[in-house]
Amino acid sequence: ADRELKEMLLKKYSGCLSRLRSEFLKKRKKGKLPKDARSALMDWWNTHYRWPYPTEEDKVRLAAATGLDPKQINNWFINQRKRHWKPS
């Protein structure tokens, strides 16, 4: 009886389930950057604290060093300045 119920439910809802599954897979998981990447970005941040605006060259170098893409580098600096920078 359980098997019949399971088959009936699968038949009825398999379309919905596969749509949901693909939707979940599309949503990127939000997470922290890798620890070594964060520490490389923090090193740059700490040595440039008075003016923490990396040039495009800096961003390319940081991307190469951390394995992050330039957009991630950019977003990290935007967030970091917004959360932790008090211009003097």
Swiss-Prot record:
Q: Where are the bilayer-spanning segments?
A: none
DNA-binding segment(s): 25-88
Per UniProt, subcellular location reads as: Nucleus
Enumerate the CDD domains for this protein: homeodomain (cd00086)
Q: Name one GO molecular function term.
A: DNA binding
Question: Which domain of life does the protein's organism represent?
Answer: Eukaryota
DNA-binding recorded as keyword: yes
Identify the keywords attached in UniProt to this record, alphabetized.
Answer: DNA-binding, Homeobox, Nucleus
ELK domain: which residues? 4-24
One GO cellular component from the entry? nucleus
**UniProt xrefs under InterPro entries:** ELK_dom (IPR005539), HD (IPR001356), Homeobox_CS (IPR017970), Homeodomain-like_sf (IPR009057), KN_HD (IPR008422), TALE_homeobox (IPR050224)
UniProt record similarity statement? Belongs to the TALE/KNOX homeobox family.
Its function?
A: Probably binds to the DNA sequence 5'-TGAC-3'.
Q: What is this protein called?
A: Homeobox protein knotted-1-like 11
Q: Which organism is it from?
A: Zea mays
